[in-house]
Amino acid sequence: LQEALKDFEKRTGETMIQWSQFKGPPNPNVEYIPFDEMKNVMVVMNGVMFPINGPGTPRPLNRPNLQQNEEKNHHPDE
């Protein structure tokens, strides 16, 4: 990635913005949560806990085509 940025700077003469410029001081109002604890997020629906992105979470094999969904949900005007 660094090589690509350097190549871009050579070709265009423009300097790409470094990600470190976006990183500000940590917000004291936000509690830090380690990444390992974020791996297994649980959501409670109707009193039942569902893992969101933990192991054993079913993954969709393919996303339904948006156009097909529109055709299924289309109600003809009467």
UniProtKB/Swiss-Prot annotation:
- Family stated for the protein in its record: Belongs to the PPP4R2 family.
Role according to the record: Regulatory subunit of serine/threonine-protein phosphatase 4 (PP4). May regulate the activity of PPP4C at centrosomal microtubule organizing centers. Its interaction with the SMN complex leads to enhance the temporal localization of snRNPs, suggesting a role of PPP4C in maturation of spliceosomal snRNPs. The PPP4C-PPP4R2-PPP4R3A PP4 complex specifically dephosphorylates H2AX phosphorylated on 'Ser-140' (gamma-H2AX) generated during DNA replication and required for DNA double strand break repair. Mediates RPA2 dephosphorylation by recruiting PPP4C to RPA2 in a DNA damage-dependent manner.
Which superkingdom does the taxonomy of this entry point to? Eukaryota
Bias type Basic and acidic residues, positions: 69-78
Segments for region (Disordered) = 53-78
List GO BP terms, alphabetically.
mRNA processing; regulation of double-strand break repair via homologous recombination; RNA splicing
UniProt-annotated location(s): Cytoplasm, Cytoskeleton, Microtubule organizing center, Centrosome; Nucleus
What is one cellular component GO term in this UniProt entry? cytoplasm
Kindly list the GO molecular function terms attached to this UniProt entry.
protein phosphatase regulator activity
Keyword Nucleus included in the entry's annotation:
yes
Under the subunit heading, UniProt states: Serine/threonine-protein phosphatase 4 (PP4) occurs in different assemblies of the catalytic and one or more regulatory subunits. Component of the PP4 complexes PPP4C-PPP4R2, PPP4C-PPP4R2-PPP4R3A and PPP4C-PPP4R2-PPP4R3B. The PPP4C-PPP4R2 complex appears to be a tetramer composed of 2 molecules of PPP4C and 2 molecules of PPP4R2. Interacts with DDX20/GEMIN3 and GEMIN4. Interacts with RPA2; this DNA damage-dependent interaction recruits PPP4C leading to RPA2 dephosphorylation.
Q: What is this protein called?
A: Serine/threonine-protein phosphatase 4 regulatory subunit 2
Which UniProt key words apply to this protein? Answer: Cytoplasm, Cytoskeleton, mRNA processing, mRNA splicing, Nucleus
The answer to whether UniProt assigns keyword Cytoplasm to this entry is yes
